[in-house]
């Protein structure tokens, strides 16, 4: 896949998946209306803002790496030709999923909406099942020892403190 095709495909998939999961659906649940803050502490909203600010660039950077380095998209119908192990992928194997859940949970805390916390937990569970049942077996088949080495050094969900460097 050419870089331009990968970029366009990734942009389309971004609108279909993360923008819907972390934008449209949370909006449909909360209408982005503030409720009394969690624990009756207004400062808790700052934690929500921090999660959103961390998550949005994480999704964008990871999508760009799929297109420009992987020469593919995050979508299963147009997977990357190269294993992406740079950027946030040096810290965690699933930065797009981690970032999407961070944005959802950030909105839950910002707007103090328990329903959005539940939605975020369900989305993470869905991502976990997809990763275990489909993505990891597919990546093992596609990239073999390179992916095995990556898995041995980079955690699935909780980021490493230092970046991993492939040898």
Spans of features found by a protein language model:
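Solvent-exposed interhelical
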Residues: 89
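Extended, alpha-helix-rich binding/interface surfaces that flank or overlap catalytic cores
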Residues: 94
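Membrane-anchoring alpha-helices and their flanking helix-loop junctions
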Residues: 1-86, 98-167
């Amino acid at each position: 896949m050419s870089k331009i095709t990968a970029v366009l495909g990734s942009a389309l998939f971004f609108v279909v998946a993360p923008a819907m999961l972390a934008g449209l659906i949370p909006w449909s649940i909360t209408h982005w209306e503030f409720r009394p803050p969690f624990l009756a502490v207004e400062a808790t909203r700052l934690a929500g803002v921090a999660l959103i600010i961390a998550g949005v660039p994480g999704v964008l950077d990871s999508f760009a790496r799929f297109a420009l380095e992987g020469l593919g998209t995050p979508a299963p119908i147009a997977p990357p030709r190269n294993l992406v192990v740079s950027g946030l992928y040096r810290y965690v194997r699933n930065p797009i999923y981690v970032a999407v859940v961070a944005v959802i949970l950030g909105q839950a805390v910002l707007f103090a909406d328990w329903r959005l916390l539940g939605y975020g937990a369900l989305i993470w569970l869905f991502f976990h099942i997809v990763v275990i049942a489909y993505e990891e077996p597919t990546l093992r088949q596609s990239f073999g020892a390179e992916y095995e080495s990556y898995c041995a050094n980079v955690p699935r969900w909780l980021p490493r403190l230092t970046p991993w460097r492939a040898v």
